[in-house]
């Protein structure tokens, strides 16, 4: 019995272990599935929560997911798609159902009062004309006359009507086709507007990202410069104690230390503000403590240009040009729409009409109806040249749109040329700044050696340190200038 109990206990423990392991595997599988299906925005948010560095692509994904303008453009594109679907329905037949009730103070009379009086007294009148003196016969004829009057009664003081009508456009002068073309173009424009908002968002986030990176590198530079002048200050203080330097030399270096500390504070403030802007653009709390992937690098990586500013065919990637081209197309369709208003229009209609009283059965108080089919033709004849004026105005709008498109093409050409030129100039500045850094480092090394040997003054060392800092700062500026110039060139060509 004890052995049986032990066996049962072991079996239960094994089953519990298997169940726990199964739950663990299921949980792990669920987490892996969620990670696979997570959007780039969710993955970026998790990375921020984990405290990891944010890459440029991560910031891009977060900005695209958060940007309100871009979200609005997506809704506008969906709205344009619904309007296009609405325009398609104009080709199809439409069914309308109507009903009504009318209560009148008087009913329609088919007989006038004289006819009613004659019919009511027809027996008396015929008796006088034919010499019939039998009152019973006259009364019978009068009663028959009253029945005739009652038979002509419409009894329509209360009228009820219901109808169902189907209308099919046959020819509307091209208005339906033009309206559908306009709806198609509007949907394209909505998509282009969304792309334009996307490119603007990417341009802004790229500029902000590289601004933060440059300020981080400048902060590192400012701290390095502060360490240099602090070391010089320590050396000068020791020399003053040893009697080989004057107090004036120490004051000069102290002023330089204060300036370096002020520079560090200014760069820290600028870096904090730039990070606030980056966090706001990415949809994070502005006080978030973020770290960018390119901050840790000693230098900003300079990549080769991925676009060619001389590629004029690529200019048509610009959403602005595509929008203006669509505007020209819409104005042309608007001309057709204005012309269609004054062309013949043909409609096919059919339906069923039901009324009470029944006009097809002596106005009896019951519902009855009739089927009907017809063709409606509308031909404008004379409207004092109104259609001609509207068509001319629409053509003038097309001309204006074409001129705006041509002017914008010229401006885009100029913008691309300017961005390409600025990129080349930025690369030249970077090459010169790199050479200046090498020379400044050598100059600083020689100044330190000369100062230790006693052949150079503290002012010479401070000048060398200042020149080194300026050279390093110019190099950082040129690196970021290349990055921003590349972003601007991509935006100018439309390759964001």
What is each model feature region?
Residues 32, 259-284, 437-495:
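Short segments within alpha-helical structural elements
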Residues 20-109, 286, 292-329, 409:
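Bacterial Sec-pathway N-terminal export signals of envelope proteins
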Residues 1-24:
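Bacterial Sec-dependent N-terminal signal peptides
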Residues 26, 54-58, 82-84, 192-313, ...:
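Periplasmic alpha-helical coiled-coil/stalk elements that build and connect Gram-negative outer-membrane
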Residues 40-51, 98-164, 295-304, 336, ...:
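Small/polar, glycine/serine/threonine/aspartate-rich low-complexity segments that form flexible
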Residues 71-75, 88-89, 153-156, 170-198, ...:
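Sec/SRP-type N-terminal targeting helices
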